[in-house]
Amino acid sequence: GLALSILIALAAICFALFSGEPYYVQVIIWVFTNAVLAVTLRFVLLIGELNIATAAFFGIGAYATAVASTIYDLPFFISLLAAPIIAGLISALFGWVTLRTKGPYFLLISFAFTEVVRLFYTKSEFLGGNSGMIGMFPPMALNDYFPAIAITILTAILLILYLTERSNLGRVFKAIQNNEDIPRSVGLNVIAL
């Protein structure tokens, strides 16, 4: 089961990285990037709510980096800092507004927010419209290290989320998933968590 899946994934990664084919390396980087998105969505599911807006926050971070790099001509590494800052602020605002809703209402709000963000990207000329933003290139010196950087980021996120899930906070998330009234009855502010 799981061990075989991990072994096959590691074999595919090694093949892609050592083949020397840029296409395979790019595919592996995209797989790791989407794995980060999948892992964060799974983490959000710990509280028992499906938050489709996770994809919107992912896109907001990507576009924040691209805008900082291409429009404002900030250095690449400074531009990378824009992603967590902008996406984090917008997600905190989104959570503050929507976390009082539950079930299908929360799902519909998160879906609507994601659609609004998508429409904003595709209809904004300064963001490239349907074609997206063009002209954001990382430093050439990093090209050979991108797979290692992607693996490191994914591993760090997996470790952080694994430890969080097994911490007291993770247990509180599971309690909220099972019955939100129980954590409230012992004085926990469910909305703040």
Per-region residue spans from a language model:
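Transmembrane alpha-helices and adjacent helix-loop boundaries
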Residues: G1-L193
